[in-house]
A protein has these predicted regions:
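Charged, low-complexity intrinsically disordered segments
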Residues: 2-206
């Protein structure tokens, strides 16, 4: 059963985002807020995803939620091939690394883009942490608002908690695979699930 007060949780999460922007709060507060609601007895439905390849080429599925999923969109006159490209381009831009920025824009392979993102010069962890969530939200907002078929899929997830069930990512994912016993128990997640929260934020804005 999905409780009707889901919107209250989303509002609380969005308030945490605003507060974090204004007061430099940690983005771990997003997970903390969800956990607090669960501890009070609220229950939610969950949609776990991981990977960017569709099972059937003709049918949009949850693979479209991935940062690596191929989906063209434009922001401020610049064309992007996937949200991984946007995220890493903005990372390079944030630290004024024009060389890596241009290399990222001229590469559409998300694996290579991710590697380039790790080469950004003058990188400072605290600065990236302060900006990463908003960057991913903006990239996904453009992706889903400019691709109607993808937007319809995201909206079809309704009130589900979106979970990046990556066993190897404890920042953007939950640090657990979808078939793990705790994948649908946020109280036992090993990661922050920032991508999942960003997608839910975008869903609310569409």
């Amino acid at each position: 059963m999905i409780y009707s007060d889901y919107d209250d949780c989303v509002i609380s999460v969005k308030k945490e985002v605003k507060d974090r922007q204004e007061n430099k709060m940690s983005d771990s507060q997003l997970l903390t807020t969800l956990q607090e609601h669960i501890k009070r007895g609220q229950k939610y439905g969950y949609l776990c995803f991981w990977g960017h390849r569709q099972k059937t080429p003709e049918k949009i599925d949850k693979s479209c939620l991935s940062q690596w999923y191929p989906a063209k969109f434009e922001i401020e006159g610049v064309d992007y091939q996937n949200t991984e490209q946007y995220m890493m381009a903005q990372k390079a831009k944030l630290f004024n690394d024009e060389n890596i920025f241009q290399q990222i824009l001229h590469t559409d392979d998300p694996k290579k883009i991710k590697a380039l993102g790790r080469q950004v010069k003058n990188y400072q962890d605290e600065i990236w942490i302060a900006h990463r969530y908003e960057i991913v939200v903006q990239g996904n907002l453009a992706k889903f608002s400019q691709n109607n078929h993808l937007q319809q899929f995201l909206l079809s997830t309704s009130e589900q908690i979106i979970v990046e069930a990556s066993p190897v990512d404890q920042i953007w994912g939950i640090g657990l695979a979808a078939d793990h016993a705790d994948a649908m128990n946020p109280l036992k997640w090993k990661g922050l699930n920032l991508l999942g929260f960003a997608l839910m934020d975008v869903r609310k804005q569409l």
